[in-house]
Amino acid sequence: MAENENHVLSIRMSHPYYSEKEISRILSTRDPKENNLRMQAFAWISTLSKTLKFPVRTSGLAMLLYSRFQLFFPVNEIPLLECATACLVVASKIEDTAKKFRDILLAHYLQKHPGSEVDAHSQVCYKLIEENKKRILGLERMTLELICFDFRVRHPHNYMVKFAKSLKFSSSTASIAWNVCTDAYKTYTMLKYPAHIVAVASISIACKLQQLPQPIIPRSFFAPPALTEAVIADILDLYMHYQPHTCIGNMYTTEKLLGLCVDFQRAQKNSGRPQKPPQIDPHSSSLADEYRESNKRLQESKESCARFILDCDRKYFNTEFEKRMLEERRNKGTV
């Protein structure tokens, strides 16, 4: 190994999805009040996106990035609004809808301080923007590292439109399903299941809301009933606890949504499928604990670095990592 070559201390592979057990393990150690703060962050992203005229796919991806960020970093460790804005910055670049960074910072300041009259070209405005610039840039870097610079994204809306056309749904039903897809970004379901499963679940919920018979889902949709029902459960849970923060919640009464949830739970019990919650070992470390420990080791080692890889390169770099760790232990005389 060359003397000036940085040692790869950590190899991080992109994980587009996490299991129900992995997410539950992280959330079991968190304050339930964090969910309310997460909804505040989503409201901030939605309002800022409307101000900057971002499309739904950009604001939705920003919410998805924020949910991932909050899994690995508790709310009390990060500035809420600045983190939400940083996620929106990353999402705008991934979706190729980027705005000038200065315009985003200015919109961030004006939204944080409503009613303030600041000239966008004044020296005062420049100083106010610079105060948040470094902080948001730092959070942007953390977000990029958290997703391992993996910019592959699939949105449920695209699948939903294709499925709705295939099933010959009316425009009103498709419109409701579209809003359900948008609400799905405010849950963890987008981190657990592929976008096409979320699309099928959204169509099912839209049919229930309009009291239409459930469509027969073709096998070509590749949407197993068990996965679809798991997504439906997550979205209905959002409507039960955070109705005012959702698109559908503003279209239907609480009684309507509550009845929908009760009917779904009753159908789940009668289906005969086991409804066992994931078994969580309280003594095992979570993904968030391991990630923070890895960051700590990198900060303590001045000459080490992390390597970010996609799934196709995992085998090669895992072998390389094992060789380097063995070499390090030999140099220290521990082998």
From Swiss-Prot:
Alphabetized InterPro entries for the sequence: Cyclin-like_dom, Cyclin-like_sf, Cyclin/Ssn8, Cyclin_N
GO molecular function terms noted in the UniProt entry: cyclin-dependent protein serine/threonine kinase activator activity
Keyword Transcription tagged: yes
CDD domains membership: CYCLIN_ScCTK2-like_rpt1 (cd20547), CYCLIN_SpCG1C_ScCTK2-like_rpt2 (cd20546)
UniProt superkingdom: Eukaryota
A single cellular component GO annotation: nucleus
Ranges for domain Cyclin N-terminal: 26-151, 158-241
Chain segments carrying region Disordered: 269-293
Keywords from the named record: Cyclin, Cytoplasm, mRNA processing, Nucleus, Repeat, Transcription
Compartments reported by the entry: Cytoplasm; Nucleus
GO terms of biological process kind: mRNA processing; positive regulation of DNA-templated transcription, elongation; positive regulation of transcription by RNA polymerase II
Outcome of gene disruption: Cells are hyper-sensitive to actin depolymerizing drug, latrunculin A (Lat A). Deletion mutants are unable to complete septum formation upon LatA treatment, but are able to suppress the lethal, multiseptate phenotype conferred by the constitutive hyperactivation of the septation initiation network (SIN).
Role, per record: Cyclin subunit of the CTDK-I complex, which hyperphosphorylates the C-terminal heptapeptide repeat domain (CTD) of the largest RNA polymerase II subunit. As part of the CTDK-I complex, involved in RNA polymerase II transcriptional elongation and pre-mRNA 3'-end processing. Together with ctk3, required for ctk1/lsk1 CTD kinase activation. Together with ctk1/lsk1, required for the regulation of cytokinesis by phosphorylating 'Ser-2' residues found in the heptad repeats of the CTD.
Family, similarity comment: Belongs to the cyclin family.
Quaternary structure (record): CTDK-I consists of three subunits, ctk1/lsk1, ctk2/lsc1 and ctk3 (also called alpha, beta and gamma). Interacts with ctk1/lsk1. This interaction is dependent on ctk1/lsk1 kinase activity.
Official protein name in the record: CTD kinase subunit beta
Gene expressing this chain: lsc1
